Amino acid sequence: MFFVKKDIQKLLSVMIPILVAQVSTAGVTFINTTMAGHAGADDLAGVSVGAGLFYPLLASIIGLLMAGTPLMAQLIGRKERESLPFIVRSGMVIGLSVWVLFTAAYIFFIDHLMAALALESAVEYIARYYLMTMIGVVFFIALMIPLRCLTDTAGSTSISMKLFLMAPVVNGIFNYLFIYGHGGMPALGGIGAGLATMITYGFLLVLFVLVVLKSKELEGRTIFTSLSLRTQDIREYLVVGVPSGLSIFMEMSLFSLIIVFLARYGTDALAAYQIADNFASLVYMLPVSCSMALTILIATAVGANDMALARRYKKAGFVVAMAGAMITASFTVIFRSSIGSVYTDDAAVALIAGQFLIYSAGWQLFDAISTPIQGILRGLKDTRISFILMVLAYWGGCFPMSLFLDTHTTLGADSFWLGLDFGVACSALLMVFRLLYVERKLDGRPVPTFAGILALLSGRKTAPAAVSVYTISLHRNVKKAEELLALWTEMEEKLSIIMQKIKESEVDIYEEMGRILPIRMSLLTDLHLSIIGHATRAYIP
């Protein structure tokens, strides 16, 4: 119990600063929306349209660049801190490349996009130039996120917490100046909110650069005094980051698409959806922060080849996430009417929102399973399959189920919430299976194969991979057994020689091999036992 408590304390020490930073970032969006709303309805509408178009892309870009976290954490675990600057520079190069693409997309497609939206002229003007200011936001974030990955892993998550706490204050000050035209500045309305956001992130970038430069532990001067890159670092960054970024984009795209289908149920249903979705997004910061903390801790443990510690952090993560979900879900259900009233004075909208909030409580419970697992898998640099499973869960499960319930039942707008619950549940189930698969593979244990599953479903008592050994053991095919036994003996002798050399060597590169080779020898021993007639459960279910 002491170890569990200690691991939970360690997780919380990393997670809480991340949570505070997440809330501070959300505060910037809240301040923009609130202050733009006081400038006028057109300003609020323009900012809402611009933010609705931009923030799914921004979240995807951040998801891509946050891939630096597991890469750097594993380097720290392996005590290879001298390689950290290469990862930071790789992230910056990738981020700047994304910024160039975003800028080009704005230049060439903004007119077509505005025409397709068919907005009122005043709203279109604000949305167009609000999105222009977001070009600057992407530029600053492209350079800032790799530095945040560095401070979170090589330093402390409290660094980014302290810096992000300044964001709402700085943003509020510049909103006051540029939205309303105080201090001799022009009154730009909603466009001023975008300009204030750009200045805020530029300010944060400067702070991160100063912190990194002043810290010897963060290899700050090495980062900025050299421009050298390594192709393998960029490739690995993309391999881990692209699936993460795409998964965020696909998930947010689905939620945006559901709004389109809800439109036919009226303004009240749409407003209620926005209320429930906004509150659920705020609560979602808890499992997301837990997930980000798990990525750092598990990647560091894996880099140090301490899988036992990684498993303890995994258990601590589930305890924290589930405890948090039980509290927030209970709060959501019990106080759903009050929550709706905070967002609106319209009793009808608040009533519908309260009903939707019950469904969002289901999200919270399933997210407490799937989201931490995503962080664990990121720590293991396993993101590609997770992305595929997420797409299957949401676009192959959630969306079809929502449409089916909408067209074949009388549930109305509730159909889409039930579909979302179904999708999140599918995501949680698939993530559990993926984690179990990856863990068995890392442990050197036999992993289930598609052919083996088919054999099991068809009623066969043995998996295809075990049939040949089982047949040899059962029928005593002496010649074949002797050939395999000779091969086993030869390989065992070679492995013993290699193991002896590894023990005598002090070269760090052999540390991981030293863990893998005994596993392989254990598997060979099982094969030997199977051949001579003592089949093990690993081969004969």
Residue ranges and their predicted role:
Residues 36-55, 87, 122-126, 190-191, ...:
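Interfacial/gating helices of multi-pass transporter permease domains
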Residues 13-29, 133, 167, 200-204, ...:
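Transmembrane helical elements of multi-pass membrane transporters/channels
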